[in-house]
């Protein structure tokens, strides 16, 4: 089976590449060159028939991922499908099913069947439920069976925590972290390694893993098991040692034509973000960087979508290629529909703010909004806003008598005042 990367290396411009080139207004040569060298990826499993392809990486708009899925405390697949609909409504490019309870294949199959967004999973979450074994009873090859079934079902990318091998685990043990390992998949693998006194199965059998990905053109999202879960732990030896391991695994995947993106922090002080983005790009030779936040403070409980959006904007401006959304429910509970909506909007704002910095052409929509404000064209403003529905609702809640202003400024609307005076008209505030 040939992958998007293999095709690009051969100079073959696939249907998926054509769609991405049109969406991003990029040339054929630019896209082929950067997919071939791994700086751009197009996650597109051959079995995901409903996919509307998107690219992630160098020279492209920053993409946004939405996490959803059930847990043992909240098993309501119908609500999770409503979250999918909400993600589609806002034009989200990626959705990850992080279900970690019970038999998840039916929901995953439905997700692949209906979603035009690329679908990601974390197979290790599904291991206990799929295999019907407790963690200690699972053997190394069992984990690969789960990966195979996820790949066959049509998921476009998988988070695989292959970098927390025995070397990285040794460095972690020597670190003095406040929050240890906060990655769910990473903590499960570390626990398995310790209980079995064995190497990480995804690292030990990495070539077998690559064979599975090659068969279905699954993109590897190399997970950061040792990402910092607190600002205190950011940029420490454990995090960086794993990143070095991921850089080596990236090259091995590229050698056989498998697309890769790298997952990143996490929690991180705002002044460390740019250096971390540059470090990933340097070590991993430009592989796309997919970050969770980063959250720039640890005390924003209930408002972590704001902490994440602040960090996400800086990360995107500094080179991050995809942002994983953070909701107000982060660290507290499974998010509800309103949490998901707020997380989506906050993260889309962060992604766009970053794009204005690194892709000047992305300012055009902002200029249109400014023009609409100057012209006091409310309908156009609602249309251009990231969440125009909420903008219109808020405007109408205190709708002004004179539509040449809003209820904030009334007759003292600066836009209206200047429009009148520059046309040579008198301004009356009475």
UniProtKB/Swiss-Prot annotation:
Its cofactor is [4Fe-4S] cluster. The keyword S-adenosyl-L-methionine applies. It is an enzyme of class 4 (lyase). Zn(2+) binds at residues 267, 331. GO terms for molecular function: 4 iron, 4 sulfur cluster binding; carbon-carbon lyase activity; zinc ion binding. One of its GO terms (cellular component) is cytosol. Keywords: 4Fe-4S, Iron, Iron-sulfur, Lyase, Metal-binding, S-adenosyl-L-methionine, Thiamine biosynthesis, Zinc. Binds 1 [4Fe-4S] cluster per subunit. The cluster is coordinated with 3 cysteines and an exchangeable S-adenosyl-L-methionine. It catalyses: 5-amino-1-(5-phospho-beta-D-ribosyl)imidazole + S-adenosyl-L-methionine = 4-amino-2-methyl-5-(phosphooxymethyl)pyrimidine + CO + 5'-deoxyadenosine + formate + L-methionine + 3 H(+). Its EC number is 4.1.99.17. GO terms for biological process: thiamine biosynthetic process; thiamine diphosphate biosynthetic process. It comes from the Bacteria. This is Phosphomethylpyrimidine synthase. It comes from Campylobacter jejuni subsp. jejuni serotype O:2 (strain ATCC 700819 / NCTC 11168). The gene is thiC.
